[in-house]
């Protein structure tokens, strides 16, 4: 209940209600099942505007890795394109990370989403504070922070380092390349549901498509490129690499 009230207070329900957005939802059989839809409905979207998949309980997560990456969200991508939805939102199995599919059915890099959310928090929600990000997270966040004269702190790998900074109360946002987002007005930890809701809110408040928001963003900031490659390794291979 407390978590529900916090999330409800974090987004502009009036803007979302008036937007008439059509949203695709994929909890990947995980902890956000039911909650993503509930928050959208409580924010004013009509049930017929919300298209959801994988809300049933499946302890095998559809026999896929439920990490909200491009491979896991192929069905959400098809759903968005088929039904001509404005955006697709998803969470990983324990709902602490997010995944976003644009209106063209393309998966959007977490690095890009994190920078867009920061710009949204500052420009549309008028929030202030410092920003912290892990060492592997894109410096695109620095571009946004510097443009608004906000301090940026780089942390080692591991969200616990960001947690500690968020607990000081001096930081507006904590960001991690692996789709981890923390915002000062919420709990000082990753929250995938809130991250998804902030993207929907951003579109509603700006009254623009995601594609238009992204194009306008890159008129102001330089393009940054990043790519993540996951390699399956045996325990022996991991041990060998760690020794090096």
Language-model features and meaning:
Residues 27, 63-68, 105-109, 132, ...:
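Alpha-helix capping and helix-loop boundary segments enriched in small/acidic/polar residues
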Residues 1-81:
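Gly/Ser/Thr-enriched, mixed-charge loops and adjacent short helices
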